Each structure stands twice: as structure tokens, then as C-alpha cells.
């Protein structure tokens, strides 16, 4: 945090002095031009080198600015220092605000991602449980189907056995009836029970 403040202070410090000196040099430039004009070489030399004189004026306007600031005294310096202190405080507040916002955003994002992970894990557990139940149901269904098929097979077997017994009894009854009929024919007697209808 201290490093960020120091960096921001360094960035802010160069910017504020620029607006202050910009206002002062306009007046100073006029004063310097007035002062510099008599100090110029004779007109003959100016005609020969007009570009050099213009360049000297530009260079001279930049150099005397610190001297004028010293002349103005502690009033401008105090104002500039107060402005720098205010801007420093504002930049520190802004940096703190951005830091707090960033912390809050990161904290919220972390919680949201934690909730997403929790939801995904719970969903995966439920899906695994559902799949397990489906597998158990499929297994039970297969077992039940196998039992039913076995019961059907047993029923079919019993039915076949009963049919076979009925066919065997019918064969025996037919054979017995034929034997009795042959016996009655041979003896010439009539059966005691003729038909149940009569």
C-alpha cells in the first residue's frame, strides 16, 4: 500500500507545478522581452541573424522562471505546496477507494466462484446417486424379469405335465373301454351301465 502511495505521489507531483508556472511565465515573458530588448545587439546584427535572436529569446524565457518564483516568495510556494498536498491527499483517497473496490470485487468474485463450485459438487453427488439408483433399479428389474420368466417356464412345464397325464389317462380309458367292449362281445352280455343319458 505504501509503495502504491509513493508511486502515485510521484506521478501527481510533476503534474501540479505545470499549471502554476504556465500562468506566471506569461507575465514574466512580457517582462523579460521588455528587459531583453535593450540588451540585444545593434540592428545591423539582427538583420544578419534574425533566427538566432528568436532562439535566444525562447531559451531566455525558460531559464529565468525559477528566479521569478524565488522573487515571488513563499506565498506562491505555500499555495503550490498546499495544492500539491491537496492533490496528494485526493490521490491517496482515490487510490484507497480503488483498492477497497478491488478488494470488495475480488471478495465477491471469490464467494461467487465458491458457491458455483459448491453447486457443481452437490449436483455431481446427486447425479451420481441418481445413476446408482437407476443401476439398482435396472438390476432389480433384470432379477424380477428373470424370476418371472422362470415362473412362466415352471407354469408351462406343469401345464405340459398335466396335459401329458390327461392324454395318458385318456389313452388308458380308451384302451379299457375297448377291452370291456371286446369282453362283452365275446361273452354276449350287455354292460350294466349303458350311457348316463338313458
UniProtKB/Swiss-Prot annotation:
<dbReference type="GO" id="GO:0005886">
    <property type="term" value="C:plasma membrane"/>
</dbReference>
<keyword id="KW-0813">Transport</keyword>
<dbReference type="GO" id="GO:0007267">
    <property type="term" value="P:cell-cell signaling"/>
</dbReference>
<dbReference type="Pfam" id="PF03766">
    <property type="entry name" value="Remorin_N"/>
</dbReference>
<dbReference type="InterPro" id="IPR005516">
    <property type="entry name" value="Remorin_C"/>
</dbReference>
<feature type="compositionally biased region" description="Basic and acidic residues">
    <location>
        <begin position="1"/>
        <end position="11"/>
    </location>
</feature>
<dbReference type="GO" id="GO:0048032">
    <property type="term" value="F:galacturonate binding"/>
</dbReference>
<dbReference type="InterPro" id="IPR005518">
    <property type="entry name" value="Remorin_N"/>
</dbReference>
<comment type="function">
    <text>Binds to both simple and complex galacturonides. May be involved in cell-to-cell signaling and molecular transport.</text>
</comment>
<keyword id="KW-0175">Coiled coil</keyword>
<keyword id="KW-0472">Membrane</keyword>
<protein>
    <recommendedName>
        <fullName>Remorin</fullName>
    </recommendedName>
</protein>
<comment type="similarity">
    <text>Belongs to the remorin family.</text>
</comment>
<dbReference type="Pfam" id="PF03763">
    <property type="entry name" value="Remorin_C"/>
</dbReference>
<feature type="coiled-coil region">
    <location>
        <begin position="97"/>
        <end position="184"/>
    </location>
</feature>
<feature type="region of interest" description="Disordered">
    <location>
        <begin position="1"/>
        <end position="24"/>
    </location>
</feature>
<keyword id="KW-0597">Phosphoprotein</keyword>
<keyword id="KW-1003">Cell membrane</keyword>
Amino acid at each position: 500500500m505504501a509503495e502504491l502511495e509513493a508511486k502515485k505521489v510521484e506521478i501527481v507531483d510533476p503534474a501540479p507545478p505545470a499549471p502554476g508556472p504556465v500562468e506566471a511565465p506569461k507575465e514574466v515573458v512580457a517582462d523579460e522581452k521588455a528587459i531583453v530588448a535593450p540588451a540585444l545587439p545593434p540592428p545591423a546584427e539582427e538583420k544578419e541573424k534574425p533566427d538566432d535572436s528568436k532562439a535566444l529569446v525562447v531559451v531566455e524565457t525558460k531559464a529565468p522562471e525559477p528566479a521569478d518564483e524565488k522573487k515571488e516568495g513563499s506565498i506562491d510556494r505555500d499555495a503550490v505546496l498546499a495544492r500539491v498536498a491537496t492533490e496528494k491527499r485526493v490521490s491517496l483517497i482515490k487510490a484507497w477507494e480503488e483498492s477497497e473496490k478491488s478488494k470488495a470485487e475480488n471478495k465477491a468474485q471469490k464467494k461467487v466462484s465458491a458457491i458455483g463450485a459448491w453447486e457443481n459438487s452437490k449436483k455431481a453427488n446427486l447425479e451420481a446417486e441418481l445413476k446408482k439408483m437407476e443401476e439398482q433399479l435396472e438390476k432389480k428389474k433384470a432379477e424380477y424379469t428373470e424370476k418371472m420368466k422362470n415362473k412362466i417356464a415352471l407354469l408351462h412345464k406343469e401345464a405340459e405335465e398335466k396335459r401329458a397325464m390327461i392324454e395318458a389317462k385318456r389313452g388308458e380309458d380308451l384302451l379299457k373301454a375297448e377291452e370291456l367292449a371286446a369282453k362283452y362281445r365275446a361273452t354276449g352280455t350287455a354292460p350294466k351301465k349303458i350311457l348316463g343319458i338313458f
